[in-house]
Design a protein with these regions (language model features):
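Metal-dependent de-N-acetylase/amidase catalytic core
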Residues: 1-105
Length: 105
């Protein structure tokens, strides 16, 4: 769903395993925010839920982002880093979004 073939393949395999075990599937949209717009038919917007996170969880996300030094600096001089300011700000919001499919889907 996120547009990266390796990540989509891993997600598909994990989703199949969850469904085989009768578990609900939650998918976190990481890159969909970059290529989709509201109403984009490729995205199951009706399956999206928002879950609040605690201040402690936000702090842990901040610490985790800091560990990705290679993505916090420009790969090429003069270009923005992969994890630019907008991506970091979105990651530190006190809410996480997921697409939820029940076990029968």
């Amino acid at each position: 769903m996120d547009g990266h073939p390796d990540q989509d393949a891993a997600g598909d395999a994990a989703s199949a395993a969850c469904r085989a075990m009768g578990c609900a599937v939650l998918q976190a949209p990481v890159w969909v925010w970059h290529w989709a717009t509201p109403g984009d038919a490729r995205v199951p917007w009706s399956q999206m839920v928002a879950l609040k996170t605690s201040p402690a969880a936000v702090e842990l996300k901040k610490q985790a982002l800091a560990c990705h030094r290679s993505q916090l600096s420009p790969v090429v001089q003069g270009q923005a880093p992969i994890l630019n300011a907008a991506i970091r700000a979105r990651a530190l919001r006190p809410v996480e979004y997921f697409f939820v499919q029940d076990a029968a889907a």
